[in-house]
Amino acid sequence: MTSPLLELDHVTKRFGRVVIAEDLSFSVGPGDTVGIVGPNGAGKTSLFGLISGDLAPGAGQVSFAGKNVTRLDSAARCRLGIGRTYQVPRPFTDMTVFENALVAAQQGGGLRRKASYAAAASALERTGMAGEANVPAGRLGLLARKRLEIARALATGPQLLLLDEVAGGLTDPEVTVLVEIVRGINAEGVAVVWIEHVVRALTSFVSRMTCLYGGEFIGDGTPAEVFENPRVREVYLGSDTIDTSTVEAVIEEEGTS
């Protein structure tokens, strides 16, 4: 049996009386594709913070590649192989696309000059941004900014890629482009955990989905199994008898609110 690449063991995080994560246990294997859904404020982005090191758990353990990384900060975890994107891409707008990827390779990945240049070039190639390498990032449209955000995470050399709503705000054809980029990254052996309200992006890509609500996991399985889960239906619609297509529509609607 393959050992988990990522493992959260009874992780809890609170801010005062506000529960961010409640006794979460969660694992991801090498090369896995996992989608995470949940209502706004469910704790999805906070979960990524606990995985990436942006947040420290109050209790429990986070392990990555067989190492206890609970007390490591985000920079150390990044260099071990955890790359992530953020909901709102914020590239260095006065730098070129290539320079943005280069900074990520050097500062995030800790790579030296020659290796960092190769990593940056590879990341742009894999995200379809090589042709815009010399374009100032401030001139990019939304899809290109999303691709650059992924490229910056890739430039750090991740074994695990955390995607935080990278399909938000895109048209259907643009979502298709993005999914194919992520599919190619996963085909290289990179595990992907993807938070998303654009359900069609997840259902066309992930093999496993989990639903987070109030800092707790309330459903886990294939996308179909999660959408058919009575608890998930009740959380989204106040009823456990609503059909699956309605649940999917409500999740997407939340992403635009």
Stretches with model-predicted labels:
Residues 2-257:
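Glycine-rich phosphate-binding loops of nucleotide-dependent enzymes
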